[in-house]
């Protein structure tokens, strides 16, 4: 396979996943901060959560230079419609569509149509983005972004031959998922633990909704209760999101999928899987360490 084609498919996988992950985190943050109340303490906590979201996005200096203070007024537009932000939802979909445009004869027409249609929809919404301000409209918008990602993945699963191109696209998708999940968990975990430590008493009544929101941002709330059948606790939340071998949005699951994709590419290229690009990436992390590692992460 030509390196140009492989590179484009890899980045399509990353950009579509990045758009979905940004929609997930922004949607949950928007609704979670609304429930914090209006006291001075709640206002400070609300700002901390918006600053955490900017930290997850990875470019706080650029955001502050343009928007100043992080809030529900400034962060969602920056992460959603700002074309100067290469990681905004609009930018990610535009870049995925641009990569796909050069592959019109290499991918199914349905894949191109999904990306092109959603790109055009987003461009239209940029011109009247003020109409989606408000909790309900924002939720519907971000839900549509997630559904677009799911539609694209479904069309891809149904139409793309399981050859090298498929493996490159999957490698990009799951590498992006592992990276964004690790970054989000790192930032959110420390923020919530600090808030719990400063809360009165044991902090459980105050912080339980925040941990539930963290699970919901990964679509992990129902899987958590199915797998653990216990109350929401920091240790088991970390265990699920980091180490679960069966939850598809866990870091371990995503890294294993990257590993499998690289192995398939190595085999297709006639490399030795033990020494070529398919060499296991699991040896680089704590994913085989079991739940003791989760306990360490949870303090």
PLM regions with names:
Residues 1-299:
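Alpha-helical transmembrane segments and their helix-helix packing motifs
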């Amino acid at each position: 396979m030509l390196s140009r084609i492989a590179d484009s498919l890899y980045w399509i996988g990353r950009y579509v996943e990045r758009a979905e992950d940004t929609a997930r985190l922004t949607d949950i943050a928007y609704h979670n901060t609304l429930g914090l109340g209006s006291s001075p303490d709640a206002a400070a906590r609300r700002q901390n959560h918006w600053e955490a979201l900017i930290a997850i996005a990875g470019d706080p200096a650029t955001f502050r230079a343009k928007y100043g203070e992080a809030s529900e007024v400034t962060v969602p537009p920056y992460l959603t419609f700002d074309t100067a932000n290469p990681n905004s939802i609009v930018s990610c979909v535009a870049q995925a569509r641009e990569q796909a445009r050069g592959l019109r004869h290499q991918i199914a027409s349905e894949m191109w149509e999904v990306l092109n249609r959603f790109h055009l929809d987003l461009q239209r919404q940029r011109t009247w983005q003020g109409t989606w301000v408000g909790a309900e409209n924002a939720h519907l918008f971000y839900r549509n972004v997630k559904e677009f990602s799911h539609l694209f993945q479904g069309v891809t699963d149904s139409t793309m031959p399981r050859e090298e191109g498929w493996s490159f696209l999957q490698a990009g998708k799951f590498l992006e998922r592992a990276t964004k999940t690790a970054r989000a968990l790192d930032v959110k975990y420390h923020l919530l633990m600090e808030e719990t430590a400063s809360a009165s008493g044991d902090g459980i009544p105050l912080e339980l909704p925040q941990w539930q929101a963290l699970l919901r941002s990964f679509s992990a709330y129902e899987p958590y209760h199915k797998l653990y059948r216990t109350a929401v606790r920091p240790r088991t939340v970390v265990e699920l999101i980091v180490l679960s071998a069966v939850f598809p949005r866990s870091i371990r699951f995503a890294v294993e999928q990257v590993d499998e994709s690289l192995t398939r590419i190595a085999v297709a290229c006639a490399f030795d899987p033990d020494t070529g690009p398919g060499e296991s990436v699991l040896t680089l992390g704590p994913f085989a360490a079991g739940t003791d590692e989760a306990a360490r992460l949870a303090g």
